[in-house]
């Protein structure tokens, strides 16, 4: 999957990300990846569900990947942060 079909979830309102996913599909993408880490994971799940249930019912979840990243902290240690990638597919 090309890197341009990835939506990174942050602190913006959920509907901003929903619009980004819908735009990707409308531009011809067959798959769109939604990626988030930490507290944004629940927002990523919300985005995927809103896209599927409200706007594009033909879209399905192809794959969900979860993992952990080690991020450096301000005091020089490392902190584990959870990650998720939800891949949506349009038939």
Swiss-Prot record:
Keyword list, A-Z: Acetylation, Chromosome, Cytoplasm, DNA-binding
Single annotated GO MF: RNA binding
SUPFAM superfamilies associated with the record: AlbA-like (SSF82704)
GO CC annotation: chromosome; cytoplasm
InterPro entries per UniProt: Alba-like_dom_sf (IPR036882), DNA/RNA-bd_Alba (IPR013795), DNA/RNA-bd_Alba-like (IPR002775)
UniProt signal peptide: none
Protein modification: Acetylated. Acetylation at Lys-11 decreases DNA-binding affinity.
Entry keyword Cytoplasm: yes
Main location class: cytoplasm
KW Ribosomal protein (keyword) present: no
Chain positions found as N6-acetyllysine: 11
Protein localization: Cytoplasm; Chromosome
Family: Belongs to the histone-like Alba family.
Name of this protein: DNA/RNA-binding protein Alba
Organism for this UniProt entry: Thermococcus kodakarensis (strain ATCC BAA-918 / JCM 12380 / KOD1) (Pyrococcus kodakaraensis (strain KOD1))
Taxonomy of the source species: Archaea, Methanobacteriati, Methanobacteriota, Thermococci, Thermococcales
Gene that produces this protein: albA
